[in-house]
């Protein structure tokens, strides 16, 4: 496996680790509605950071974006909005199916859709079937799915042992939302594919290859922000027991603490895609769609490991932990299969 591909896989692992940890600061926020907390974190992650980093990277911020016509920017924005819808459905999926089943189905679907639809859209699916490297990366995708399934099973065993149930279990509604979540969440993969002209333009301006994808986040995450913030603001305006005014009527130290914690969560959320861009830059162009598979499978891997570190599995017993460990090993094997396939 080449050093470039090894580093690409490593950066995807770092990004996924940040994704697995980003909600920890949000859990420390006190006496705020979820909508206010999510909005503050989202403003940091979807608006402030993409704009600020792009302004630092680009020699002429407005000239860069002004060179693209609507036919280039609109698909990138709409795929970002599609991914934003997936974000909202993710929370509802957990509500009706529980964490383990919800994550397993949603992540499994988005892993397949986001990874395999991109070469189909680009007319390159034959690379997966008719080349040795393509067949090997395809094998890696299916091994990763097995790993996700094993980790999901471990989570179910843990929930059963600890008596954890879905907030409002509804299999029919939960499965529908999980499928929608999986499909719509793949919008980020499609957006990155649609943003290739933006990446090429950034490279032409002398932006380091590791950073060329970051300016496109202004548009991609702008679409996601529109959906997520719109959802939160509508709820804050219409739901009777929710109020921004009440959330900001707390003591000043608590407000400052909540803002800082939400901002930290937003920063960690953004870092997942900051390092995703680094990993994406190291993946061979003909296999760039594999970035999504690596990110999502590593997200499940890191989520399990973070849970162990935070002692969330302490009272689950040996069997769930053993099954979790097996699933993590399978995901690591899948990443290595994909890496070897990309060097073939």
UniProtKB/Swiss-Prot annotation:
It comes from the Bacteria. The chain crosses the membrane at residues 4-24, 38-58, 68-88, 101-121, 137-157, 175-195, 214-234, 259-279, 290-310, 321-341. Keywords: Cell inner membrane, Cell membrane, Membrane, Sugar transport, Symport, Transmembrane, Transmembrane helix, Transport. One of its GO terms (cellular component) is plasma membrane. It comes from Salmonella gallinarum (strain 287/91 / NCTC 13346). It catalyses: L-rhamnopyranose(in) + H(+)(in) = L-rhamnopyranose(out) + H(+)(out). Belongs to the L-rhamnose transporter (TC 2.A.7.6) family. Uptake of L-rhamnose across the cytoplasmic membrane with the concomitant transport of protons into the cell (symport system). GO terms for molecular function: rhamnose transmembrane transporter activity; symporter activity. It is a multi-pass membrane protein. This is L-rhamnose-proton symporter. It is found in: Cell inner membrane. Coiled coil: none annotated.
């Amino acid at each position: 496996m080449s050093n470039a591909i090894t580093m690409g896989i490593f950066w995807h692992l770092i990004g996924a680790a940040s994704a697995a940890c980003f909600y920890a600061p949000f859990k420390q926020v006190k006496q705020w509605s979820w909508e206010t907390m999510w909005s503050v974190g989202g403003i940091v992650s979807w608006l402030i950071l993409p704009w600020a980093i792009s302004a630092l990277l680009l020699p002429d911020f407005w000239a860069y974006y002004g060179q693209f016509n609507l036919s280039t920017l609109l698909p990138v924005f709409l795929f970002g909005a599609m991914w934003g819808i997936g974000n909202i459905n993710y929370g509802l999926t957990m509500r009706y199916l529980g964490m383990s089943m919800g994550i397993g189905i949603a992540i499994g679907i988005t892993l397949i859709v986001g990874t395999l639809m991109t070469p189909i859209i680009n007319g390159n699916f034959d690379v997966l079937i008719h080349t040795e490297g393509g067949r090997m990366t395809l094998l890696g995708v299916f091994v990763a799915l097995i790993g996700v399934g094993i980790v999901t099973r471990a989570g179910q065993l843990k929930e059963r042992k600890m008596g954890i149930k879905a907030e409002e279990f509804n299999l029919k509604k939960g499965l529908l939302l999980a499928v929608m979540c999986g499909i719509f969440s793949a919008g980020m993969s499609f957006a990155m594919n649609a943003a290739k002209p933006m990446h090429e333009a950034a490279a032409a301006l002398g932006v380091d290859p590791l950073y060329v994808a970051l300016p496109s986040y202004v548009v991609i995450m702008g679409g996601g922000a529109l959906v997520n913030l719109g959802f939160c603001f509508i709820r804050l305006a219409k739901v009777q027991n929710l109020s921004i005014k009440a959330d900001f009527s707390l003591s000043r130290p608590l407000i400052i603490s909540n803002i800082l914690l939400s901002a930290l969560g937003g920063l960690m959320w953004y870092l997942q895609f900051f390092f995703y861009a680094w990993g994406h830059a190291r993946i061979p162009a003909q296999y760039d769609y594999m970035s999504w598979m690596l990110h999502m499978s590593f997200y499940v891997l890191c989520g399990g490991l973070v849970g162990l570190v935070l002692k969330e599995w302490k009272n689950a017993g040996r069997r769930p932990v053993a099954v979790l460990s097996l699933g993590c090993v399978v995901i690591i094997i899948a990443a290595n299969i994909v890496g070897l396939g990309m060097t073939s």
